[in-house]
Amino acid sequence: VRLALATAALILAGCSTDSFVGPLAYTRSERLAIDLRTEEGQPKSRLQARVNQVMDEVFGDAPNHMKVPPGSGLRDGGAWLAANAVLPSKERPGRVFYERAGTEGTTDLVFIQGGYGLYRLHCLHCHGLSGDGMGPTAPYLWPRPRDYRRGVFKFTSTNSMKPSRDDLRRIITHGVHGTSMPAFESLMSKSDIEQVIEYVIFLAARGETELALVNEAMSADDADADTTVTNELGLQLAQTVFENWKLADT
């Protein structure tokens, strides 16, 4: 697969159709409020704020304004996450297309709707905007939808807690018997499913990085927030998380 639009240093802008209206904000981890407290039980507000700021810097401040950390291993640098890619040399997002295998050099290009848009359409109502398993339908389901943010998945064929892309492809395509996870084979094309896979990996890596930042900040003094929770630390933790995802596909 080769993109018709270069995707280095991507910032991604999501779709803006009527299907995706409403406020767009990631749900912050409950660990921010629970773990980042003093011995007296007072919130470490500066550390909490720094974790949020670093997450915004590394992954983007909203689902429709994503940043893809370098070295993520996501397809084509993350261009499959959203319908439009904002390049450093451009002021406006450009539509992203890819070439079907075997059609290189032709004009037979497929528009990437984007894993973000497809996720909002098909998955958000159960798995939530942040992948926390707290979508509006979730309270009525048992077992509850998976919380991607922990980076732990049950149905895997790998030796690690991370599923391979084949695992995710199988689950999304065929569903999971005995759970509320339906089969999407008749609702999404193969291309759509591939884009959702990339977005699920992005959400899971984002959530796991957030938890890792909280763990780093737990023992720090609130006054040291700026030197303890840095953008460099956030990027380093994100790259470590993405490396574990890459291993699942080896």
Spell out what each predicted region is.
Residues 35-118, 213-250:
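Electrostatic cytochrome c docking/interface patches
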Residues 1-6:
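Sec-dependent signal peptide recognition
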Residues 12-14:
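C-terminal motif of bacterial Sec signal peptides marking the signal peptidase cleavage site
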Residues 7, 118, 143:
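Flanking scaffold residues of small Cys/His-coordinated metal-binding clusters
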